[in-house]
Amino acid sequence: YVALFYLVVKNNETMAQIGLIVLGAAFCLILDGGVIELLVKPLAERLRPINDPSLKQLLDIVPGTYENSFSFFSAHAANTFSIAIFFSLLIKNRLFTSFILLWSFVNCYTRLYLGVHFPSDVLVGLLYGGCIGAAVYILYNKVCKKLLFKKSFFSTQYTATGYAISDIEMVLIVMCLIILYTIFRGILCFV
């Protein structure tokens, strides 16, 4: 998240623009986490795979993994995917979109691997998060049009929305390092 914040600060001219993007990202997380944790999970009351007595013996649980709340549906999947969709629509760069979606999917995979969610929890989280990310971007776009924030760039060094390719590459390096760290930690669990 820090790398995304850096990208926003470095590539927007006014505090109003930066604030609106940060507010949009925060709105994604609040809508995801708030609705899921305060409304859906308590109503669904679905046990996590690692807490389900009928499944617990079938799972190879990673030591130190323990979750006390309910499973349906995955807030991690919804949060990361809503942020991925919001920033993909905001930045409009194919390589960035590919990496931020990969980051979200790796996060989702960890939820399955650790046994804290069923596949359906993750799929519903992705669907919900995608809808939230797109809806928040549409709202962000409408507010930008009212406030007359208009950027249009035609250069090989910038995206169509004015984000410097060099800054995007820095964020991609951070995402690659996070993904490599996740893979490395997964391998260490087997050693």
Locate predicted features:
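Transmembrane helix-bundle signature of multi-pass membrane transporters/permeases
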Residues: 6, 26, 30, 57, ...
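Transmembrane alpha-helix/helix-exit interface in multi-pass inner-membrane proteins
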Residues: 29-50
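Hydrophobic, aromatic-rich transmembrane alpha-helices
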Residues: 1-11, 80-88
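Membrane-embedded catalytic cores of phosphoryl/pyrophosphoryl-handling enzymes
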Residues: 60-190
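Glycine/small-residue-rich loop that forms an oxyanion/phosphate-binding "nest" at active or ligand-binding sites
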Residues: 51-52, 58-60
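Hydrophobic/aromatic residues in alpha-helical transmembrane segments
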Residues: 1, 35-36, 83, 132
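Interfacial segments of alpha-helical transmembrane regions
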Residues: 5-36, 97
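Hydrophobic residues in alpha-helical segments
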Residues: 8-9, 44, 112-113
